[in-house]
Amino acid sequence: NVLQQLGLGSGKRIGVEKQGFFFTVDEHQTLMEILPDNEFVEATEILWDSRMIKSQEEVDVMRHSASLVDMAMLAGYEATVPGATADQVSGVVNKTLFENGGEYMGLPPFILAGERSCLPHQTGGNVPLLDDDLMYFEISASKHRYTAALMRTIFLGTPKEEWLRVAEACIDAVQAAMETIKPGATPHEADTAARDVTSKAGFAEYHRNRLGYSIGVAYPPDWGEGEIISLRQEEHRPLQPGMTFHMPPLCLKYREFGIGFSESIVVTETGCERLSKLPCEIVIKS
């Protein structure tokens, strides 16, 4: 027993990650049975606190991941044509990620066409794109397990006016949040800034998700670490330099559309910076 070899066999107070994906109830029960003279206490938040602020070296790796996402997103744009399916476009995106040095992600790319985009954590689909259609992308990339992600929506032909107004509101919401984020500001304030934009544009009922969540090291079954800290109404801890987030404000109208735009960012000493270099703009392929 490793704990016994380390002199922790009895009479010790040992922290365990009760909220970890890979520490099961059965494993916890086994520890208590074979080492009954130890006290096992919850230590998850100690680990979360150590992961919340990234070093410059960690941010640099995440910038590299963001560059992979940019390449994959552009490849996805190119492959999005009438008649193509979301599954086919997903194949192009994955090929681009792995050919350029990416590693397996915490979650697959979420690439959805037309009305299927209203349920954004579906994967793919085999229904061909129409001449006047939309394609929703939420893609991550991983390098040395450090993750960056990006959400975009592109349009084919002549998009509906409502789609374009929603897209503009989502882009403006991202920008408003970035202008709010700085050391000392709170996630509540950032979420409010984004939500004010979509509300004033008339889409409050479609914008129901939190603004964003922490990102960093990730393994399946997730690419985020929102359990550590999220950009949401209920979170009031002050933001600090070195925190990294994926911010995907999106609007979902059931059986009609899912439209969103996002940025992965790092909080700096004076504000925040994008990790991606891909423009956050409306793209229409005619």
Predicted regions located by residue number:
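Active-site neighborhoods and metal-handling regions in enzymes and metal-associated proteins
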Residues: 1-286
